[in-house]
Amino acid sequence: MSDAFETAAPPHATYDTVLVLDMGSQTSHLILRRLRSLGVYSEMLPCTQKIKDLGWKPVGVILSGGPSSVYADDAPGVDPLVFELGVPVLGVCYGNQLIAWRANPKSVAPGVNREYGETQMAIHKIGTHGDRLFEGLGDSLNVVMSHFDKVVQLPDGFQTIATTKNSEFAGIAHETQPIFGIQFHPEISHTEKGTDIIANFATKICGARPDWKMDDFSAREIKRIRELVGDKAQVIGAVSGGVDSTVAAKLMKEAIGDRFHAILVDQGLMRLNECEQVKETLDKHLGINLTVVDGSELFLGRLAGVTEPEAKRKIIGGTFIDLFEIEALRIEKEAENTDRAGKVEWFLQGTLYADIVESLSFKGAASSTIKSHHNAGGLPARMQNGEAQLKLLEPLRELFKDEVRAFGRQLGIHEELIGRHPFPGPGLGIRIIGEVTPERVEIVRKADHIFISMIREAGIYDEVTQAYAALDSSRAVGVQGDARVYGYICILRAVTSLDMMSAEPYEFTWSLMKAISRRIVNEVDGIARVVYDTTSKPPGTIELE
């Protein structure tokens, strides 16, 4: 690894940073979103993180909620050094119970009544530093609870700062140390003044300066990229036409000019006319070095007979890197004896924070990982371990989707690219359940084209964050032209989301949904039935595989 990497300061070296330790909650990421909306930089790591390996000191720590019981044998915990850092600690839900349980294992037990949803919470003013968490927020709040276990006995050294009907210790604070616990979820939007509570903790108790803003990101990241890459090395990067890779490519162009080479790989899994449209759009709006590589035969050949989703992602990720390493050698050779001469050392990806979080296991075990993301866990081991010919460069990995869109606008990227629906690197390969074959790719490609076209025609494309058609591995009986058919089931999915960490199904009008279904069944040979996926994220993910 280049020495420049050591001198390029990461954000936590520049900004006061609140560390969020994830205990497994489905809403842990919302804590980060609330902090960043306040201008406080934050990072989330699994609760298994060892403090001695952290390499930096946060100004405060938040322990998230989680689905476990603190008294269970396999309950997740945190490094005891968290409480020896000398910084404020806030426990949320499970994190609150963990703080109490560490002080007294008898203090946490199952409650008599489960407490889910909104409830009224009374704030207790006790005349000590414990009042600072709810300072300026009145005498009561409507808060969101989601728990069965609770603190049933106040641990020694703690005081009660809030109660509800079913939780006598809905808020606790240590008498002398800046350690707080709350049983409710301030990160959920339905909690009254939840963001204010997080602000009190981060800015008043931790003393974090609210100076994280996207305006600073471009200059800082360009400086970091230049230090990291140096004066001679060249960078190649995958582009798909999606907002993530487009913004990353534009940033690299700004940082190192013509030493950045964008590569659009046609892996045989693109949408209808995707390659031509993406090339035309990127050429028109970005002015970058762009090469189109046809890898369709290679990808489809390697995927033949493979049905397991993780295996497909790994194959696709590995094949991408194989092709990029070949392209790197070609670029180096063409640049010989020119002012662009230099080794291709870096591979650019538009990885976002959501990609990293989705690939994380909060317990540190592979079994807890949601799935390998194509921009994270889908890369071959040699790439992740730095053993490949190319080293990984991910300048957007600290940002959420909405932050990337805002950053793209700051860079002057055309709205046509900023507002484009996401399309995954593995393409239609993860929208075909089971084996990927040329026949099945063509079927889902046609269905997807009809779906997206009708969304555009209805004038709702910009209301939908992401939409696509997928193909199930099972088949269903149908009747077409008085004849029995036995065809595939097409799954339609459309969601709305701010940051891609959570999502809700889009509510189509019934007439439009029926019209879409009718066209797909009538116009796409091989499809006998159409269904609409109404699963939220969580518990589902946006992509099916």
UniProtKB/Swiss-Prot annotation:
Record: residues binding XMP: 313, 482, 537, 543
Alphabetic keyword roster: ATP-binding, Cytoplasm, Glutamine amidotransferase, GMP biosynthesis, Ligase, Magnesium, Nucleotide-binding, Purine biosynthesis
Catalytic residues of the enzyme: 93, 185, 187
GO cellular component: cytosol
Subcellular location: Cytoplasm, Cytosol
Reaction equation(s) it catalyzes: XMP + L-glutamine + ATP + H2O = GMP + L-glutamate + AMP + diphosphate + 2 H(+)
GO biological process, one term: GMP biosynthetic process
Top class in the EC scheme: ligase
The protein's annotated pathway: Purine metabolism; GMP biosynthesis; GMP from XMP (L-Gln route): step 1/1
A Pfam family: GMP_synt_C
Record EC number: 6.3.5.2
Protein's UniProt keywords contain Calcium: no
Primary location recorded for the protein, binned into one broad class: cytoplasm
Cofactor: Mg(2+)
CDD domains (UniProt xref): GATase1_GMP_Synthase (cd01742), GMP_synthase_C (cd01997)
GO molecular function annotation: ATP binding; GMP synthase (glutamine-hydrolyzing) activity; GMP synthase activity
Oligomeric form and interacting partners: Homodimer.
Name of protein: GMP synthase [glutamine-hydrolyzing]
Organism the protein comes from: Gibberella zeae (strain ATCC MYA-4620 / CBS 123657 / FGSC 9075 / NRRL 31084 / PH-1)
Lineage: Eukaryota, Fungi, Dikarya, Ascomycota, Pezizomycotina
